[in-house]
Amino acid sequence: MATTRNFPTCGALARAALAVAIAAVLVFGAASPHGPSRPSWTAGLDADELDLIGFAGRMPDSEKPKLTAYFLRESYPRGGSARLVITDTATDVSVQFFRAGGEREETIPNDVMLGSAASTPQPIGDVTGRRELSLRLGNWPSGMYYARLTAGDRTGYAPFILRPHFLGEHRIALVLPTESWQAYNFRDDNRDGRPNTWYAGGNTARLIRPFTNRGVPPHWRQYDAPFVRWLVQTGRNVDYLSDQDLRTAGSGARLAAAYSLLIFSGHHEYVTKHEYDVVTGFRNRGGDLMFLSANNFFWKITIRDDVMTKVAQWRHLGRPEAALVGVGYRGNDRGKHRGPWIVRDIHSAPWLFAGMHLGLGGSFGSAGIEIDKTTPSSPRQLRILAEVPNLLGPGLSGQMTYYETPAGARVFAAGAFTLAGAVWSDDIEPLMANLWRHMAPDEPATA
């Protein structure tokens, strides 16, 4: 039986350097004379799929005492109610809400979420097997939030996005990759020894379920947490949206009426047709796009009854992602090689490198893991501003690009992992600040 809890809000939410540690490889077992052994669920996967499993980082699940819980939606409105499911047995459980990004320090472990308290701890008593709660949310700022559950030495996290009351409370929206998070969730839901994701075979993954590592989204600390913290700590106020909110956005025209800029900071690999349509329509109506990682809008998925089905690569369906993003996915070496971006064009976007004392051939940052590159489908007016040359071999370069459309849209793409994850580094933060000033001039930082 569901119960409702009201959480009193705390006072004002609180308002620096990150070393990005990324690649975690899949452990296939003890070595043998014929190479490492592999679990049975990898049978039938091709080499590229196995490489992607390695990238996805099927990190061993946390061995710390945990509580398992999840919300029944990817996002909830400010001031509404959220339904939390707890699937463990525990005594004297307490729940407290936090806003991610309010923390002053970087997140280090893969099984921890940090933030500033949005409510006080509330005891909910004992839990046996499964319990569903209806929890009242405060009228907090839109953002990335999580419920932290504790019972003695046990801790669990249940993340969700707190969306605005209506689209366009701010003119900029950050879209977090909730579908990709679940695609890379190696949780064994039915306990048959096989992770329930298409990276372990098959073509489906559940969208509403707990994450491994005590409930923390995959690669949260590397790809997403640094950028969310940067936005919050520097007073860059935006609407936070989930993929669910794009799926229900209605049309590109509606998005364009609400927002001037959509930011895709993370690994936005999987999208539905409707998501692809509304973002393309947004761009076609002059909406600006910012892609701060790589391998975006690559796979088509369908969703039915909260189950995602992987269909095909968009480029094989006549809709190459490069026509929208500017660049298309080219390769992944699981982080074996890294290199700096090298400046290739100052004149097409002098604003991007302003104050950084960089000329042609100058270098900044450290990129790798996955890379994007221009293709014949890239817009003709596109300019390559910088690249990570020959990272995966001759001609296999990650390319940072920018283009503008006749309708006035401006589209920036990083071309490699990851500007968002490195935003606190000394040579990336100035570039990100320049990019923000150019593409979000009406939303200055307030901190």
Model-derived features with residue positions:
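Bacterial N-terminal signal peptides
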Residues: 16-27
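C-terminal region of N-terminal signal peptides and the immediate post-cleavage residues
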Residues: 25-38
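Proline/serine/threonine-rich low-complexity linkers at boundaries of modular beta-sandwich domains
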Residues: 37-66
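Ligand-binding face of N-terminal immunoglobulin V-set domains in extracellular IgSF glycoproteins
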Residues: 68-91, 97-103, 110-162
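Aromatic-Pro/Gly-enriched surface loop or interdomain linker
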Residues: 87-101, 152-255
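Helical hinge/lid and interdomain linker segments adjacent to catalytic or ligand-binding clefts
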Residues: 121-127, 133-136, 216-304, 423
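An acidic, glycine-rich "communication" segment
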Residues: 295-395
